[in-house]
C-alpha cells in the first residue's frame, strides 16, 4: 500500500524511567524532552521506580490524548556509573586501549561510542583524576580518564561499546560552568583528551 508510512525511527541515547512494576514508563531525550512510553517492544524490565541509561531505536508517536509518546523498537543498556577516585579501584587502575568513534555532550551526561577488540569481557568505568572548584567564578574543572580492563588481548574483529558519564554530581551549588576533560588511551599508543563545557541548568 503506497499510503503506508514507515515510522521515523531514531537511534539515540535516552534516560529511561521504570514504574512500580519495573517496566519502562517514560524516557527523556538528550534535548530534554520527556516522552511517555506508548509501547516497549523489547519488554525491558528493570528495578522498580529506577532510571537507566540506554541507547534505543525509537519512534515518536502521538498518544490517544494528542500528546507525544515513544515506541521503543530496540534497546541496549549503556554503561553509566559515577566516576570514582583512583583509591576506590581495589585492583588498581586499568587503562587498556580503546578507540573513540564518537563523543558528545548530552543532557547531564557525556556520551561516547567506543571501539574495542572483540575478545570476551571488557570492564569499563570512569576514573576521577582531579576536580578543581572555583566558587568565586562559579566554574569547576573535572579531569576524567576511561577505565578499561580488556582481560586477554586476543585478536580479531572489533565491536562497539556505549558509555555515558553522569555529570550532575559536579553541578554543586553556585557552579554555573563545568569544564570536562576526558582522556582515553588509544590503540595507537596515544592518550587523547576531549574537552567539553557542561552548563548545568
Indicate residue ranges for each PLM-predicted region.
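Bacterial Sec-dependent N-terminal signal peptides
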Residues: 1-20
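Short, solvent-exposed, Trp/other aromatic-anchored flexible loops in extracytoplasmic proteins
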Residues: 149-179, 185-187
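Short aromatic-glycine-enriched beta-strand elements
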Residues: 19-27
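Short helix-loop boundary/capping segments
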Residues: 101-153
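Short acidic/polar inter-strand loop motif in beta-rich domains
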Residues: 58-67, 172, 182-193
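Surface-exposed beta-loop interaction hotspot
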Residues: 62-115
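A short macromolecule-binding patch
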Residues: 33-38
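Short nucleic-acid-contacting surface segments enriched for D/E, G, S/T with interspersed K/R
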Residues: 41-56
Amino acid at each position: 500500500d503506497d499510503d503506508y508510512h514507515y515510522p521515523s525511527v531514531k537511534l539515540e541515547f535516552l534516560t529511561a524511567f521504570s514504574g512500580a512494576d519495573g517496566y519502562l514508563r517514560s524516557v527523556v531525550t538528550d534535548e530534554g524532552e520527556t516522552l511517555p512510553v506508548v509501547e516497549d517492544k523489547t519488554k525491558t524490565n528493570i528495578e522498580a521506580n529506577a532510571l537507566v541509561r540506554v541507547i534505543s531505536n525509537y519512534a515518536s508517536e502521538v498518544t490517544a490524548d494528542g500528546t507525544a509518546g515513544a515506541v521503543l523498537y530496540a534497546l541496549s543498556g549503556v554503561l553509566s556509573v559515577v566516576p570514582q577516585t583512583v583509591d576506590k579501584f581495589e585492583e588498581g587502575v586499568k587503562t587498556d586501549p580503546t578507540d573513540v568513534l564518537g563523543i558528545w555532550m548530552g543532557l547531564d551526561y557525556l556520551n561516547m561510542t567506543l571501539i574495542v577488540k572483540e575478545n570476551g569481557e571488557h570492564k569499563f568505568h570512569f576514573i576521577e583524576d582531579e576536580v578543581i572548584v572555583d566558587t568565586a567564578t562559579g566554574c569547576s574543572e573535572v579531569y576524567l580518564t576511561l577505565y578499561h580492563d580488556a582481560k586477554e588481548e586476543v585478536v580479531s574483529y572489533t565491536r562497539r561499546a556505549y558509555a555515558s558519564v553522569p555529570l550532575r554530581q559536579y553541578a554543586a551549588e553556585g557552579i554555573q560552568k563545568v569544564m570536562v576533560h576526558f582522556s582515553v588511551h588509544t590503540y595507537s599508543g596515544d592518550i587523547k583528551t576531549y574537552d567539553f563545557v557542561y552548563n548545568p541548568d
